[in-house]
Amino acid sequence: MRLTYLPLFAGIAIQSASALPDFFKSSVLKPRRTNSLLINPDAQPDLPTAQQASTAAASVGLNLTDIQGDILIGMKKNKEMFFFFSIADATAFKSHLDSAILPLITSTQQLLTVATQPTTAVNLAFSQTGLNALGLASQGLGDSLFASGQFSGAESLGDPGTSNWVQAFAGTGIHGVFLLASDTIDNVNAELSQIQSILGTSITEAYRLQGEARPDDQQGHEHFGFMDGISNPAIDGFSTALPGQAVLSPGLFLLAEDGDGSSSSRPSWAKDGSLLAFRQLQQRVPEFNKFLADNAALTQGNADLLGARMMGRWKSGAPVDLAPTADDVDLANDPQRNNNFNFTHPDFTETTDQTHCPFSAHIRKTNPRSDFNPLNTANHIIRAGIPYGPEVTDAEASSNTSSTDASLERGLAFVAYQSNIGNGFAFIQQNWVDNANFFFGKTTPPGIDPIIGSNAAQNNFAPNSPRPVSGLDPTDSTTIVTLNTDFVVSRGGEYFFSPSLSAIQNTLSV
C-alpha cells in the first residue's frame, strides 16, 4: 500500500475562493487533516491532484466545488455510514438543510487535498418520494426508473422477489440517504449524531448500514477476496486516463453535462447532480469458497484459478486476460498495466477462444471492452461502494455455511453513479449480467455472470435458481457448468438523486 495518498498543497488546495459558493468559503480553507480520510491501494488508479483536477475541469467547464464528493471519487472510502431516512416535517427539514446541513456537504474539490478534507465527508441524496416530499413532484428528472423506485423493478433486476429485502427498502418509504465517510467509525458516528441533532424531529430514521474497508492486506478487496475498484472509467474534465482505461464524457454521470443524452428533459437545477443506484448485496463467502474447492478439477485442481476465471481477475487484481495461468502481484499493483487489456490476442478466434478470460467472467460481463466494435461508450457506471460486515468466522469456514446471525452478515454496499439508470446500472444487470447469451455471437453461449448473475426470471423467481456458465474450464470452452447456489443475495436498495450543492441551496431548501 502507498504510504501517502495525495500531496499536501498550501497554495493550490482548492480552486480560487471566488469560484466557491458563499456558504462554502467560510470553512473550506481551514486545514483540518494531516492524513487522508481515503484509502489508496496500489492496484487502484490514483485520484488527480487538486491542481490537475482544476485544470482538467476548467477545460470542459466542470465546477468541482459544486459536485458532491462521492460521485467521481470511486471506491476509496475507509469507513462509511449509509443513513437512510424519511422526511417527517418538510418545512423544518428545508430550513435546517439550508442553514446547517449544507455547510457540512463535501464537494469533489475538497476531497482531492488532505488539507481541505473535513474530519468526516458528508454527501446527501434523495429518492423520488423524497423529492416529492420537498415539493418537487412536478419536476421530474427525466429518468423513469428513478421515478418509479427500485422496489417496483426488483424482479427485472433478477431478484427472486423481495422476501430477502431489508424491510426498509420494501416500498417507497425512504426519502433520502446521508453518506458519511472518514478514517474512523468514531468520526462517522460523531458527525451522524450532529446531523441528527440538527434535523431533530424533521426526519425519522429508516435504516442504517455501516461499511468499512477490510483489514490489513485486504484493504481494497471485497469479501470474496478480490481487489476491487480497478476499472472505473476516467472522466473527461476530471481524471487522466491510464492505459486501457475508458475516457468518458462527464454527462454519462453528471446530469446536463456534455454527453448526457437526456439533457433536454432535465430541470435546470438538476445540472451536475447524479443518479445513485444503491444495493445491499450479501456475499455468501463460505458457500463460494466451498464451490471453488469442490470444483477445482475444472482448473486442474487449482481453486484459486477457478475463482480468478469466474471473476476475471486474481485476488490480487491481476487480470486473467494478461495472467491466464498464475497470479502476478507485480502486474496487479501496477495501474499502468493492470487495466491495459481488451480480451483479444494474436491468433485468437474471438467467437470461441476462452483460454485467457472466459466470456462469462464477471469483469467481462460488466465491461465487455473490445467484445464491442467499436468500443461501447454508453453503458458505464462509476462504482463507489464499500464492504460491510465482519470477516468470516471460524465456525462459518468449517461448516462452509454463512451464519444466519444478522450481526454476521457481510457483503458489498454497492453504489453506482450514472446520469441514466436505464443505460447504466439497470442496463448492465439486465442485459449483460443476467443474459446467458451475452456477449452475442459466441459459438458457445457465455452463460450468466457466475458472481452476481441471476437466472431467477427463468425459474419462477426462485432463489438459488440454476444458472449456466461456460468457459470455466480453460481446456474446453464448450463445457457448461451449472451453478445451483447464489453467492450474492440482494437485500434490496433504492435509487437516489445526488444534487449539486447549489441545487441544495437554491431549490431543495426553498
Swiss-Prot record:
Its cofactor is heme b. Keywords: Heme, Iron, Metal-binding, Oxidoreductase, Peroxidase, Signal. Heme binds at H362. One of its GO terms (cellular component) is cytosol. GO terms for molecular function: heme binding; metal ion binding; peroxidase activity. It is an enzyme of class 1 (oxidoreductase). Binds 1 heme b (iron(II)-protoporphyrin IX) group non-covalently per monomer. Belongs to the DyP-type peroxidase family. Peroxidase capable of degrading beta-carotene. This is Peroxidase 2.
